[in-house]
Regions:
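Structural motif
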Residues: 31, 153-166
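Short Ser/Thr-interspersed hydrophobic loop/turn segments at strand-loop and sheet-helix junctions
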Residues: 167-181, 203
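ATP-dependent adenylate-handling active sites, centered on carboxylate activation for C-N bond formation
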Residues: 1-141, 158, 181-212
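A short, charged helix-loop
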Residues: 140-151
Length: 212
């Protein structure tokens, strides 16, 4: 389409030289490495424009994340009674080596969706590992955060539940915050047309899993 794209290679030295500033602009610890690339992208865009359009919200509204396919792809496995799946999940976590194919699958499906899914993010530690590391007053309690959200969509299908949780946690507290702060750090306004009210209303007309 005869489109001219600008490219920038971030050197290791640039990374380390700017890391402390990037963290300062984020205001709080955020374990999302995309913030660094977004900072440099905003820096380059700000050389030519003051306002940009971004696609934040499209994946959450229209089922763009691969993880949303999981409930649809593994319906047969999920017919196995939950007590058996829990046993398999516990066995995988305790006995199978990290990185072994199938370990993560068994661990995920050894729990209900409400127990295992809190955002479109990767766990660094299992709950058992986190319990061994953290002090007693800091035990992981993510379900205290997600339970009210799941309660609001308890009658919906699994894909819709995942999208709902992502829209209220992942999108708000990571995606939008990161885009806004990295843009503003470079005096760049980042607008998100997919989160227009009418687009949201259109997305809500989809039957569960339809977009996926």
């Amino acid at each position: 389409i005869n489109m001219k794209n600008d490219a920038k290679v971030i050197t290791p030295q640039e990374y380390w030289d700017n890391l402390s500033d990037i963290q300062y602009y984020m205001d709080e610890p955020v374990a999302d490495p995309a913030a660094i690339a977004l900072y440099f992208l905003s820096q380059e865009a700000a050389k030519k424009v003051k306002v940009v359009l971004s696609g934040e919200g499209s994946d959450e509204l229209f089922g763009g994340y691969n993880i949303y396919c999981e409930p649809l792809e593994h319906t047969s496995f999920n017919k196995i009674p939950m007590p058996i799946r829990r046993m398999l999940g516990n066995f995988a976590e305790r006995c199978l080596p990290r990185g072994m194919k199938g370990r993560g699958f068994l661990m995920r499906h050894g729990k209900t969706l409400e127990e295992r899914y809190f955002a479109n993010a990767t766990n660094i530690f299992t709950e058992r590992e986190a319990n061994r590391i953290l002090k007693k007053g800091c035990k992981p309690g993510i379900q205290k955060v997600t339970a009210p959200l799941y309660e609001r969509v308890k009658d919906k299908d699994s894909v819709t539940k995942m999208q709902y949780v992502d829209m209220h946690l992942w999108l708000v507290h990571d995606i939008l915050m990161k885009g806004d702060k990295m843009g503003m750090a470079n005096s760049l306004e980042v607008r998100v047309p997919f989160l227009d009210k009418k687009v949201l209303e259109l997305a809500q007309t989809q039957v569960g899993g339809q977009a996926v």
